[in-house]
């Protein structure tokens, strides 16, 4: 019998069949053992060769008497045994032919499965391997590109951050300058107000001086008129009193004195007025120059403040746009990174599935190889059995005519064992990781 178990089983079956025929002097003994074990998934089958053993027990025959009935009985029994063996051999040949057909069929199936396996390996190697390598190269290229883009974006971000810091510092400086300009402008406005007040004061002073000059001029004219009237009166008196020369000379002296005093006073008044007017004009010019310069500086500072305000607004807009672009780039990069991570995870799952499928194909291939090995071993076993049967059949028959028969007493002959004995040994061995963990044996004796 043939015992096959799936690969990976740890149970071993050992079946021993012993068949013994004992017939008087001729005892053919046939022993056949079939060991089948599968430690770790490998099948091992061993069969012992068929042995034909002829024994001649101590049969004592007398020379003077020959009993041919015993020889006929032995020949008849031997012929029956040979006939039974031929029938059994014919059945064994038929079974072996069926087994050969089955082995050929299994070999063909094995070849078909091997061809399919090679085809699957070739397809997997040509299609899946190339696709996997190409996809991995593409993913590596994309990862490198994303790494370069990330580095470039980080550099741009750092540059923009530095620009923002520099612009903020510049903004602070401009704000400080603006505050200083506003404070300076405020002081200049105070100076302008003071200059305006001084100018108004000077204008009032000029008006008062002009009024005073007009009053003095009017007073001078009145004095001149009075002096002229007095001179005319004195001249009349001189004309009347011609006979008095001393009075005329005195009047002339007085008139000269008055004229010299009036001319001196008039000259002094004109000089004072001119000097005062020159001083006031110079002060007014100075104040006008200071006012004009203050106005120019105020306009210049106002223009600077407006330009700085516009520049600050432009820098704020640029900063906001750059920050918005940076946020958008970070969001896009995070989204692309998540997509690439999902793609990498999906590809890794596909690779794992492919590895599992390849492992399953390899296990199936290993199982097929184990089955093929077991079949080869079993074929070799049956071949040895057939060779043993052929060698047993080809043995020459014993020549009973050449036996040295002697006279004997039939009653002294031993009893002839006319029954057949068949011993069946079933041995079960259970192994795990190449070590025997359980072993049982069962003996069955059958008499025929």
Curated annotation (Swiss-Prot):
Q: How does it assemble?
A: Homomer assembled from elementary dimers. Identified in complexes that contain VIM, EZR, AHNAK, BFSP1, BFSP2, ANK2, PLEC, PRX and spectrin. Interacts with BCAS3. Interacts with LGSN. Interacts with SYNM. Interacts (via rod region) with PLEC (via CH 1 domain). Interacts with STK33. Interacts with LARP6. Interacts with RAB8B. Interacts with TOR1A; the interaction associates TOR1A with the cytoskeleton. Interacts with TOR1AIP1. Interacts with TOR1AIP1. Interacts with DIAPH1. Interacts with EPPK1; interaction is dependent of higher-order structure of intermediate filament.
Please name the Gene3D superfamilies in this protein's record: 1.20.5.170, Single helix bin (1.20.5.500), Vasodilator-stimulated phosphoprotein (1.20.5.1160)
Region annotation Linker 1: where it falls in the sequence? 114-135
PTM comment for this protein?
One of the most prominent phosphoproteins in various cells of mesenchymal origin. Phosphorylation is enhanced during cell division, at which time vimentin filaments are significantly reorganized. Phosphorylation by PKN1 inhibits the formation of filaments. Filament disassembly during mitosis is promoted by phosphorylation at Ser-37 as well as by nestin. Phosphorylated at Ser-38 by CDK5 during neutrophil secretion in the cytoplasm. Phosphorylated by STK33. Phosphorylated on tyrosine residues by SRMS. S-nitrosylation is induced by interferon-gamma and oxidatively-modified low-densitity lipoprotein (LDL(ox)) possibly implicating the iNOS-S100A8/9 transnitrosylase complex.
Question: Which region ranges are annotated with the description Coil 1A?
Answer: 78-113
Name it.
Vimentin
Q: Where are the stretches annotated Coil 1B?
A: 136-227
Identify the species of origin. Answer: Cricetulus griseus (Chinese hamster)
Database matches in SMART domains: Filament (SM01391)
Keywords attached to this Swiss-Prot or TrEMBL record, sorted alphabetically, are: Acetylation, Cell membrane, Coiled coil, Cytoplasm, Cytoskeleton, Glycoprotein, Intermediate filament, Isopeptide bond, Membrane, Nucleus, Phosphoprotein, S-nitrosylation, Ubl conjugation
Q: Which gene encodes it?
A: VIM
Which positions carry Phosphothreonine? 408, 418, 428, 440
Q: Mind listing the GO molecular function terms for this protein? A: structural constituent of cytoskeleton
Covalent crosslink: Glycyl lysine isopeptide (Lys-Gly) (interchain with G-Cter in SUMO2): 86, 102, 111, 121, 205, 244, 276, 295, 355, 421, 427
